[in-house]
Amino acid sequence: ILYTIGWLVTLPSYLLKQKRRGGFGTGLMERFGLYRVSYNREPKGVLYVHAVSVGEVVIALKFLRAWLWERGGSAVLATSTATGHATAMNAQVPGVRVIYSPFDLLGLPGRCFDRFEPEAIVLVEAELWPNFARAAKVRGIPMAMINARMSARSESRYRAFKWLSKYYFSFLDTMGV
């Protein structure tokens, strides 16, 4: 609850900062779980890959090319930054729908998951968003974290809030470093 309140309090300043940086383009609505493409035209039963910025997107694209070549199907690649989104769009990987990640506010990740009905979620980062993770768990969507690295600074934070870290990491089904 405190996390969500914090999100709501900081959201206006975040939106203002993004506007100064060039805005969201068409991505702002996607951050609220609203999409231009008709629901019936969206891929279902996808592999949902969450990559925040350019570095994670590059790794995600390599992962997705290998995954889709081996297994087929389709995927959703969700990014959080305009540069990460542009990198993913420019790659034009067949079978991959690129979206902006929903804000981690109650209801928004779930709305996104209900739209794409992911069979699994792969996080390409060492960050776990609480409402996102909870929405996946409630829907029974397995979640994995790949490319997980932890700096000394992050480690000290996780240790300081060990009880909270244990809770958040309990949402993961597997982790790859």
Task: Describe the predicted segments one by one.
Residues 1-8:
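N-terminal, charge-rich interaction modules
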Residues 11-177:
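Active-site and donor-binding regions of nucleotide-sugar-utilizing enzymes
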